[in-house]
């Protein structure tokens, strides 16, 4: 926006930037603009001030760039999983699933999934080599990792949909154009050699006696002073906490780093579950560590391998080494499990609003680090009916008076329900819920049923603040940061549940 300033005064740096743009035919791209004696930062500052003064027309364009992630760099060095497997398959003719797992224990699932897209799928426990131009197609992917050619949109699109291989970065590029006022300012400028600021050296040398100083218009609009406000996410977290506390819940804490024993095994998630793949979970290297409550591992082993009282378990050989791996927690339900294990006398009503981590490619709707809202009730009165009641009550307090509960699937709850809300006439999934499976209750030594529900805080924030890109929640956009209270007040949370 241009701010009308009478009798515009420009600095020498601004004048030189105008002349540099003029020498390029009155239009220039900021990143390509160079002015002798001025740094890139000084040029950027001058452009911003010239725009404010109405002397430049500025067009902003978003430029997307792509770079290899740490996983992508690994594939560049070692070869894509599908290429490694295909070449080994070509060498041997056929391979069993055990041979494939031994060859590439961390990436065999990725390799199998990618080869399946070329029609190579396991038959009777074996993968059989087939030659139909597949190797050339895979090698083209490998060559792209070397070149990262931005013009190869097909490869960019392919790898954007593969989690964790390439990172997308967005930068804003400014294209600046002189307008009529700019030419007038250039013609009228007579300030070369003007002193813009007085410092001790100028006073000590006496230079100030013979030099001219830059004029300042004391009536010019000044920058808006922005008072300190809570970040919108902090504000929303406090709102959620207040809702839970007013409902009589107790807040629980947790750890960013968890053992898979607690993060997954305690919740009856099998050790070969896809969620454990390195493409979905951040694993942490550690020389030594102590697992809290190690005694639970015996019970976990028994229930995973053989089940109990008519429940069959998973029927595989449970691995203590796998259980001792460390991860950045993938959900906050691990905190619920530990809290109830340590406080196993019902009733208990607990909650948390804390960060979790997923190995996701960051885009408009995904983050690798985000907040999860978790609520749970442990009581002899827990049932599907009480779960439905408390969900309707909780979501109504968030402002969603019209919700639907749809049968779903989660590894550690049965039955499971997705929560669907209505926003501006559209139905949007906003959370999951369910009753802990009997196997989970047995592992944790619980005496009564447990109902739990959760949702992503960022998705809720996007609805409240009218955003379409989750990354905007963490950008330093001062207009958004200073007006988010107004957005809540204007939209009214109580209206979100209405069509």
Curated annotation (Swiss-Prot):
Cofactor: how bound: Binds 2 magnesium ions per tetramer.
Gene Ontology terms: cellular component: cytoplasm
Cofactor: Mg(2+)
Tree of life domain: Archaea
Presence of keyword Transmembrane: no
The keyword Magnesium is assigned to this record: yes
Binding site for Mg(2+): 414
Cellular localization per UniProt: Cytoplasm
Gene3D superfamilies: Bira Bifunctional Protein, Domain 2
InterPro entries: aa-tRNA-synth_II (IPR006195), aa-tRNA-synth_II/BPL/LPL (IPR045864), Phe-tRNA-synth_IIc_asu (IPR004529), Phe_tRNA_ligase_alpha_bac/arc (IPR022917), Phenylalanyl-tRNA_Synthase (IPR002319)
EC number(s) reported in the record: 6.1.1.20
Main location: cytoplasm
Catalytic activity: tRNA(Phe) + L-phenylalanine + ATP = L-phenylalanyl-tRNA(Phe) + AMP + diphosphate + H(+)
GO MF term list: ATP binding; magnesium ion binding; phenylalanine-tRNA ligase activity; tRNA binding
Entry binding sites for L-phenylalanine: 333, 372-374, 412, 436
Class in the EC hierarchy, top level: ligase
Keywords for the protein's UniProt record, in alphabetical order: Aminoacyl-tRNA synthetase, ATP-binding, Cytoplasm, Ligase, Magnesium, Metal-binding, Nucleotide-binding, Protein biosynthesis
GO biological process: phenylalanyl-tRNA aminoacylation
Family, similarity comment: Belongs to the class-II aminoacyl-tRNA synthetase family. Phe-tRNA synthetase alpha subunit type 2 subfamily.
Oligomer status and interactors: Tetramer of two alpha and two beta subunits.
HAMAP family: Phe_tRNA_synth_alpha2
NCBIfam families (alphabetical): pheS (TIGR00468), PRK04172.1 (NF003210)
Descriptive protein name: Phenylalanine--tRNA ligase alpha subunit
């Amino acid at each position: 926006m241009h701010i009308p300033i009478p009798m515009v005064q420009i600095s020498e740096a601004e004048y030189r930037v105008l002349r540099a743009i003029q020498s390029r035919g009155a239009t220039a791209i900021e990143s390509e603009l160079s002015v002798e004696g001025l740094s890139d930062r000084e040029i950027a500052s001058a452009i911003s001030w010239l725009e404010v003064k109405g002397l430049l027309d500025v067009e902003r364009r978003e430029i997307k760039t792509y770079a290899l992630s740490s996983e992508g760099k690994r594939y560049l060095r070692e070869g894509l999983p599908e290429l490694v497997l295909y070449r080994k398959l070509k060498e041997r003719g056929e391979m069993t699933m055990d041979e494939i797992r031994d060859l590439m224990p961390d990436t065999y699932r990725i390799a199998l999934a990618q080869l399946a897209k070329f029609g190579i799928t396991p038959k009777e426990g074996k993968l059989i080599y087939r030659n139909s131009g597949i190797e050339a197609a895979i090698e083209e992917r490998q060559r792209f990792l070397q070149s990262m050619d931005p013009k190869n949109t097909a490869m960019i699109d392919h790898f954007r949909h593969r989690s964790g291989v390439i990172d997308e970065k967005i930068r804003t590029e400014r294209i600046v154009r002189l307008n009529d006022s700019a030419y007038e300012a250039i013609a009228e400028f007579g300030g070369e050699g003007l002193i813009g600021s007085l410092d001790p050296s100028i006073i000590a040398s006496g230079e100030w006696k013979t030099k001219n100083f830059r004029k300042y218009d004391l009536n010019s609009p000044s920058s808006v002073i922005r008072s300190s406000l809570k970040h919108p996410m902090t504000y929303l977290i406090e709102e959620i906490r207040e809702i839970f506390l007013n409902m009589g819940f107790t807040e629980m804490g947790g750890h960013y780093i968890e053992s898979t024993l607690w993060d997954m095994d305690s919740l009856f998630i099998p050790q070969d579950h896809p969620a454990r793949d390195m493409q979905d979970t951040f694993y942490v290297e550690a020389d030594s560590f102590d697992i809290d409550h190690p005694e639970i591992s015996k019970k976990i082993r028994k229930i995973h391998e053989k089940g109990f009282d008519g429940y069959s378990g998973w029927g595989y050989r449970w691995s203590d080494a796998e259980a001792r791996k460390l991860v950045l927690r993938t959900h906050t339900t691990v905190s619920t499990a530990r809290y109830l294990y340590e406080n196993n006398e019902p009733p208990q009503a607990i909650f948390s609003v804390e960060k979790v981590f997923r190995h996701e490619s960051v885009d408009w709707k995904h983050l690798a680090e985000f907040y999860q809202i978790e609520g749970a009730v442990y009581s002899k009165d827990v049932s599907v009916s009480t779960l439905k009641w408390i969900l309707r009550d909780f979501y109504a307090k968030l402002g969603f008076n019209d919700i639907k509960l749809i049968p779903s699937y989660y590894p550690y709850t049965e039955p499971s329900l997705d929560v669907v809300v209505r926003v501006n006439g559209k139905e949007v999934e906003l959370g999951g819920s369910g009753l802990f499976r009997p196997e989970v209750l047995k592992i944790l030594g619980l005496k009564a049923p447990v109902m739990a529900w959760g949702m992503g805080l960022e998705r809720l924030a996007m609805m409240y603040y009218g955003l379409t890109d989750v990354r905007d929640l963490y950008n330093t956009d001062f207009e958004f940061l200073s007006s988010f209270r107004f957005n809540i007040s204007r939209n009214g949370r109580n209206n979100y549940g209405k069509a």
